[in-house]
């Protein structure tokens, strides 16, 4: 029994597949790819021919081939981030795969990069203008919780430099600081929280001063 065809991509949403067989094009417009290649499908508006990219080349792929002879990769960004596969992640970014997508546990790709200690992957994701720093997963954890719990102080510092929030509590009512497993992570988080508290107090004092001047 043949499996049902994949759902068409929403406008602007890139769907990703892994080719199970090699495809030999018959016309110059068609895209050649080999077994195991990653296919980025960007346009499914034509029911017969989908527009896709593979290894930096763009062309047409018969939609029935994708349906019958390709494997859907639901969360390519997450897979790349978990493995610390920088080149695949960069390819996902270049092919406009959404960077803030959530897996079944509510995690972003950045969460998995922080959880795995993949500093180069974290850096690439943090350089994307639309990256979400404060997304909570189903356990209420943020990327900062993950990095602090795993003891990656260099990643904690990178997240704090991008102004990741330190005041978010997870489902166990714990801050990232309370999840920190080494002194260096704890010190960075304390310093950042101290700065935020000082700034808040300073703002409050200015507000009171304004009241007094009325």
UniProtKB/Swiss-Prot annotation:
Keyword Repeat tagged: yes
GO biological process annotation, one example: signal transduction
Lineage start: Eukaryota, Metazoa, Chordata, Craniata, Vertebrata
Gene name tied to this protein: ostf1
UniProt signal peptide: none
Species this protein is from: Monopterus albus (Swamp eel)
Protein name: Osteoclast-stimulating factor 1
Gene Ontology cellular component terms for the protein in this record: cytoplasm
InterPro entries, per the entry: Ankyrin_rpt, Ankyrin_rpt-contain_sf, SH3-like_dom_sf, SH3_domain
Localization (cell): Cytoplasm
Keyword Nucleotide-binding tagged: no
Reported function: Induces bone resorption, acting probably through a signaling cascade which results in the secretion of factor(s) enhancing osteoclast formation and activity.
């Amino acid at each position: 029994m043949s499996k049902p065809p994949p759902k068409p991509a929403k406008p602007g949403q890139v769907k990703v597949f892994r080719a199970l067989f090699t495809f030999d094009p018959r016309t110059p417009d068609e895209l050649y790819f080999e077994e195991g290649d990653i296919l980025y499908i960007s346009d499914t508006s034509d029911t017969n021919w989908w527009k896709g990219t593979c290894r930096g080349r763009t062309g047409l792929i018969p939609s029935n081939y994708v349906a019958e002879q390709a494997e859907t990769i639901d969360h390519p960004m997450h897979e790349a981030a978990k493995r610390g596969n920088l080149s695949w992640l960069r390819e996902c970014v270049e092919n406009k795969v959404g960077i803030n997508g959530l897996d079944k546990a509510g995690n972003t790709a950045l969460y998995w990069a922080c959880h795995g200690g993949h500093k180069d992957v974290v850096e690439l994701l943090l350089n994307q203008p639309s990256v979400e720093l404060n997304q909570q997963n189903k356990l209420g954890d943020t990327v900062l919780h993950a990095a602090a719990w795993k003891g990656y102080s260099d990643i904690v510092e990178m997240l704090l430099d991008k102004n990741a929030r330190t005041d978010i509590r997870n489902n166990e009512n714990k801050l990232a600081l309370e999840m920190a497993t080494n002194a260096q992570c704890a010190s960075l988080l304390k310093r950042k929280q101290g700065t935020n508290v000082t700034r808040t107090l300073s703002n409050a004092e200015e507000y009171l001063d304004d009241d007094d001047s009325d």
